[in-house]
Amino acid sequence: SGPWMCYPGQAFQVPALPACRPLLRLQCNGSQVPEAVLRDCCQQLAHISEWCRCGALYSMLDSMYKEHGAQEGQAGTGAFPRCRREVVKLTAASITAVCRLPIVVDASGDGAYVCKDVAAYPDA
């Protein structure tokens, strides 16, 4: 297994991580996240291979923006009312850390907790 196995629809369902969407919407503007919301999101993420968790989070963020009419390179704020875009990206990138789920950041197998590619999402 490796990052090349992380195809959307195979490594994770599409749309990705539906249980993590409410978590992201709440967390990005500093709202309290109910325990059940956190648990559901972390459970969903835990079912995805550690190679593919960042890809799934990236796919989730991407689809949340695109559903609200954002094109590549221009962010729609409709997906995340009252949230700054850079906060949205960092919040999404940190969901693995919030859930304490390791990720594989590169082929050397180094484990980490924050998805750098998600934090660098190009729409913002």
UniProtKB/Swiss-Prot annotation:
The disulfide bonds are essential for the inhibitor activity. PROSITE patterns: CEREAL_TRYP_AMYL_INH. One of its GO terms (molecular function) is IgE binding. Its main location: secreted. Keywords: Allergen, Alpha-amylase inhibitor, Disulfide bond, Secreted. It is found in: Secreted. Endosperm. Disulfide bonds join C6-C52, C20-C41, C28-C83, C42-C99, C54-C115. GO terms for cellular component: extracellular region. Alpha-amylase inhibitor. Belongs to the protease inhibitor I6 (cereal trypsin/alpha-amylase inhibitor) family. Homodimer. This is Alpha-amylase inhibitor 0.19.
